[in-house]
Amino acid sequence: MSIAIVTDSTSDLTPEHLAALGVTGVPLYVLFEGQLYQDGVQLSARQLVEGVRAGKAIPSTSQPSPAEFAQAYAQALEHADEVLSLHISGQLSGTVGSARLAAQEFGGRVTVVDTHTVTLGLGLQVLRAAELVRAGQSVPQIVQTLERVYPQADLRFTVDTLDFLRLNGRIGGASALLGGLLNIKPLLVVRGGRVDAGGRVRGQKKALADLAEHVRRYVSQHGGARVAFLATVGGEEDRAAVRAQLSDLHFQDMGDHEIGAVVTVHAGPGAVGVALEPLSA
């Protein structure tokens, strides 16, 4: 039984990376200045940030329609027996709901998974699923593996400001970090499928040190890890600084990644983070 994988643009894997894996990415939408743009197709994260910095209002986001997922599934099933569809947390977006509605049209040939995470947290699950497909595992076997990995996975990041999360209603438990003293940097986690408070420190240098130390603890606790480094536009130097602090640590390096337009709408420019998974489930 051949298996095709479908995901959405919040995996923040580039179109080239998805194509190399044979994975289909369905874009979410950014509503910006009264126009709807497909994430990464019609609007890049850099264009979005440049617009906001020029004084345009912070945009909002929207999920793909069930019809768009149905089209992606139909195309995938032209050359595969089954589809495994992996998506952003249902507590952060209605995307997985659209995917499930579309899946009903295909008589059990499409399995939709809420990964309970976003950006490279989702991206790492897509990469693992692609590896397991190549290894010959079935859809139920892959889903079982992902369900074992998810509770152990971690996504931790810091943002330049909480305003973007607050204005778009995605702040969740991180609302406890609103306000406070000047130069206090929030540390955020995606936990249980939602954004939550991970703590706060004074100054960006300490925030980056916290991210690096978090990776060290995770690698120690899990006997190794897959680690992806991520940043929104403006956070590239800070991402490199976190990586530099880990130059002596052994882990499976999953690369540097730019967060796309949809997640940037919520995280804002200058965000930096790490996505982590155990090496094996």
Swiss-Prot record:
Keyword match Flavoprotein: no
Cleavable signal peptide: none
Binding site for hexadecanoate: T61, S93
Keyword Chaperone appears in the UniProt entry: no
Function text: May bind long-chain fatty acids, such as palmitate, and may play a role in lipid transport or fatty acid metabolism.
MF term (GO), any: lipid binding
Pfam families reported in the protein's UniProt record: DegV (PF02645)
Keywords from the UniProt entry: Lipid-binding
Domain DegV: 3-278
Name assigned to this protein: DegV domain-containing protein DR_1986
